[in-house]
From Swiss-Prot:
SUPFAM superfamilies: Immunoglobulin. This is Intercellular adhesion molecule 2. It comes from Pan troglodytes. The gene is ICAM2. The keyword Disulfide bond applies. One of its GO terms (cellular component) is plasma membrane.
Length: 275
């Protein structure tokens, strides 16, 4: 066999393997948006399109409410509404008997609308521990949430959360710290960040109202002994002064009553007995 014939056979065999049929058309299906985050009961517009010039059939598969807004041969535009849970939308087209599809992932979220910070106790001695608690009610998805605890501009602690049930949850973070002298002049705060960028959404921030501690210096044992001694002495002096005032008052009363008694008896004596 000549080299020309061998090359021709090789090319023909390659064409049969790689290109099995000239009538089988390759086409693509696209969906916009590919992913999106919406609030509960929200809606979104979805566009399904294909590169097939004359698709036989096409559409959007979903269990949610949908309305076909507009369409042409190569695309269809839908409104999907009443989205209450995470779901997958599927665009599909059939071209020359072959079906292709592409999915759009939809996530439901609730941003942090309330961030509650609590300091316990609020009156703390220097060197003693206290607890910082931050609570965010009704937020989802939890695995996209991060809570930051601040002392002034300093980040004391931050915490992320694992994937939870697909429903609004309450997120809580607790951190124990030790009070120092400057804490009485610093604001404590909490920041909630819900990052939905990976889900086709935005980033939501919500700060708590700032809180402050009341700081005092603890009293040493020697100072306590002095204070107790001084208080005891002052209390003794007070009691003694009260008793002396009472005794002195009784003495004056008796003296006055004794003088008045002699004069009254003198007046009652008959004239004959008076000198």
């Amino acid at each position: 066999m000549s080299s020309f014939s061998y090359r021709t056979l090789t090319v023909a065999l390659f064409a049969l393997i790689c290109c099995p049929g000239s009538d089988e058309k390759v086409f693509e299906v696209h969906v916009r948006p590919k992913k999106l985050a919406v609030e509960p009961k929200g809606s979104l517009k979805v566009n399904c399109s294909t590169t097939c010039n004359q698709p036989e059939v096409g559409g959007l598969e979903t269990s949610l409410d949908k309305i076909l807004l507009d369409e042409q041969a190569q695309w269809k535009h839908y409104l999907v509404s009443n989205i209450s849970h995470d779901t997958v939308l599927q665009c599909h087209f059939t071209c020359s008997g072959k079906q292709e599809s592409m999915n759009s992932n939809v996530s439901v979220y609730q941003p942090p609308r309330q961030v509650i910070l609590t300091l316990q106790p609020t009156l703390v001695a220097v060197g003693k521990s206290f607890t910082i608690e931050c609570r965010v009610p009704t937020v989802e998805p939890l695995d996209s949430l991060t809570l930051f605890l601040f002392r002034g501009n300093e980040t004391l602690h931050y915490e992320t959360f694992g994937k939870a049930a697909p429903a609004p949850q309450e997120a809580t973070v607790t951190f124990n710290s030790t009070a120092d002298r400057d804490d009485g002049h610093r604001n404590f705060s909490c920041l909630a960040v819900l990052d939905l960028m990976s889900r086709g959404g935005n980033i939501f921030h919500k700060h708590s109202a700032p809180k402050m501690l009341e700081i005092y210096e603890p009293v040493s044992d020697s100072q306590m002994v002095i204070i107790v001694t001084v208080v005891s002495v002052l209390l003794s002096l007070f009691v003694t002064s009260v008793l002396l005032c009472f005794i002195f008052g009784q003495h004056l009363r008796q003296q006055r009553m004794g003088t008045y008694g002699v004069r009254a008896a003198w007046r009652r004596l008959p004239q004959a007995f008076r000198p």
